[in-house]
Regions:
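Conserved beta-alpha junction segments in alpha/beta enzyme cores
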Residues: 1-151, 156-159, 163-179
Length: 180
């Protein structure tokens, strides 16, 4: 999406801001018109087999150069084959896959919000809905199908700056599990 606000050296897109504002008003009005009594449930599972820590602490004598040319980098992503440079993982992962489900008082699915702490990964694609989008598409197909076209699946991005899908502690990376 274009920039909605000026940030990090990028100016807000002057045509996108009013468009976005109008679309936000439309979805708020639509949501308000559909308000109804509902039931909420939640759960969580350990999904550690889908994620691993991707940042590694470097040895004090093997610190790396920062973008300004100073030797200050004590942790780096993707240790890969540089095992002699690191002392270990930079911290624990959050393996929890949390789920919040909303259904009508008649038991019809309305929405599902999932939270997962894993960094996005789009592969070679420059623009992608990534696993967030594919995950939601699959949930919408499997939970609601054509019977509940208003059902919405969402996935929020948990605390995941250091977490990725590949486990570098494994000598041979395990096959990446596909969502399909």
């Amino acid at each position: 999406a274009p920039a909605a606000m000026s940030c990090l050296g990028t100016d807000a897109d002057p045509t996108y801001v009013p468009y976005l504002r109008q679309k936000l008003v439309e979805v708020i009005v639509k949501a308000e018109s559909r308000l109804q009594a509902a039931e909420v449930g939640y759960s969580s599972i350990d999904a550690s087999h889908y994620t691993a820590v991707r940042r590694w602490v470097r040895r004090p004598d093997r610190m790396a150069q920062d973008p300004f040319g100073n030797i200050t980098v004590r942790a780096n992503m993707h240790a890969g084959a540089n095992w002699d440079d690191v002392t270990g993982e930079s911290g624990p992962e959050d393996p929890t896959l949390g789920v919040l489900a909303v259904r009508s008082t008649k038991g019809e699915p309305l929405a599902l919000l999932t939270n997962f702490s894993m960094h996005y990964f789009s592969g070679e694609a420059a623009i992608s809905s990534d696993y967030f989008g594919r995950y939601c598409e699959i949930l919408e197909e499997k939970i609601a199908g054509d019977d509940a076209p208003e059902f919405v699946a969402m996935m929020s991005h948990g605390c995941s700056g250091d977490i990725w899908r590949k486990d570098y502690t494994q000598a041979t990376p395990s096959e990446i599990q596909q969502l399909d």
